[in-house]
Amino acid sequence: SLVGSEMCIRDRLITTAAQQLLAGKMTLAALRTEMTRLAKQLPEYDIVRAMYGVGETTAVQLMAEIGDVRRFPRRSSIVGFAGVDPAVDQSGKHSAKSVPTTKRGSPHLRKTLYQIVCTYLKKSPVDEPVYQFLDKKRSEGKPYFVYMTAAQNKFLRIYYARVKECLEAFDAQQDTSQR
C-alpha cells in the first residue's frame, strides 16, 4: 500500500541520516584525537595546559586558533587578533565613553576565550589574576559583557607572556644544544 511504502521510505531516510551523523561524529572524534596528539608535541602545550580554566580540548583549540605567538610583536597584537580589544570611536574632540569590541579575527577563538572565562566565573579561584581582574571589574558595576571581555583580554595577555617566554627558553635551549 501507499502508506506502507511511505513509512518504508521514511524509515530508510531516518536510518541513512543516523548513519551519516554517526560517521560525522566518528570523524570529528578522530580529528580531535589527531589535533591533541600533534599539540602535545609542541613545547608550549604543557604551559598552556597548566593555565587555569584550560582543559585538554581548550588548550588544543587555543593553540590551533592562535598559532605561534612569536608572530605577534606585542601583546596588544594578539588581543587585536582575537577581536577582544575595544574599538576606537573618536572624531575631532568627540571621544565615546562606551565602545563595542572590534570582533575582528576568529569567532572560534573568542568562543574558546569565553568558555575559559566562564570557568573562572563558575569556580571563583580567588588567587588567579584573571579572576581578580574580572571580580574587580564586576564590583565596579561594569556590565556582564564588559567584564567578560576585559577578562578575556587579560587572559590573552597572560597567555601571550607565558607562551612567548616558554618558546624563547625552548629556542635558547635548542641553540645551545646545537653548538
Predicted feature residues:
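Phosphate-backbone recognition surface of nucleic-acid-processing proteins
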Residues: 49-50, 56, 61-140, 144
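Amphipathic alpha-helical coiled-coil segments
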Residues: 14-31, 35-38
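Low-complexity, acidic/Ser/Thr- and charged residue-rich accessory regions of DNA metabolism proteins
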Residues: 93-97, 131-179
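Short, small-residue-biased leader/transition segments that mark boundaries at the very start
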Residues: 1-9
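Short, solvent-exposed positions on alpha-helices
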Residues: 22, 46, 145-146
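Extended, structured, electrostatic nucleic-acid-contact surfaces
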Residues: 32-54, 62-65
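Conserved phosphate/pyrophosphate-binding and hydrolysis machinery centered on Walker-type P-loop NTPases
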Residues: 10, 14-18, 38-41, 52, ...
